[in-house]
């Protein structure tokens, strides 16, 4: 029960555990909402692990970051590659993080560098290892270095 109470406090107040201790409300909104990719709210998406109502008016809130990575895995693999046929990091990032809100070139270049390929090379997101690395790199661009590759891998495993 104390763990549940602490989880509610973290979610509601935006308490972020950092190496230097606890800071109230200083973590990025995606961290406060357990949404490492800042996935936008959409009434049509009934994600497993989704918290309703969201603590953020624009972005989804998840019970744990692994559920946010899970949603990202499904979004990239099933929608972006499966439905839309996006084959490169550049194509995926330009849809996920459009240039009217982001520096999409820098975003795509960073993600590609983390995967060791060019941003305009085809990428196979049916590979769990590749998908987890991509999601982890995207989380760094979205919220900073708050999450581990292992958390992204768990989200992919759950997808």
Please provide the spans of the model-predicted regions.
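Cell-wall polysaccharide-cleaving catalytic domain and substrate-binding groove, primarily
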Residues: 11-159
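Membrane-penetrating hydrophobic segments
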Residues: 1-9
């Amino acid at each position: 029960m104390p763990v549940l109470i602490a989880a509610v406090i973290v979610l509601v107040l935006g308490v972020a555990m950092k190496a230097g201790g606890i800071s109230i409300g200083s973590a990025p909104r995606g961290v406060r909402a357990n949404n490492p990719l800042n996935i936008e709210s959409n009434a049509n998406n009934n994600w497993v692990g989704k918290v309703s109502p969201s603590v953020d008016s624009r972005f989804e809130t998840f019970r744990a970051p692994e559920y946010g990575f899970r949603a990202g895995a499904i979004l990239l693999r099933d929608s972006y590659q499966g439905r839309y046929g996006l084959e490169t990091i550049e194509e995926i990032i330009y849809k996920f993080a459009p240039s009217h809100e982001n520096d999409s070139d820098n975003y795509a270049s960073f993600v590609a560098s983390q995967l060791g390929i060019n941003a305009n090379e085809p990428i196979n997101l049916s590979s769990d290892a590749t998908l987890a690395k991509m999601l982890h790199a995207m989380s760094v661009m979205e919220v900073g270095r708050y999450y581990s590759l292992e958390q992204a891998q768990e989200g992919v495993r759950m997808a």
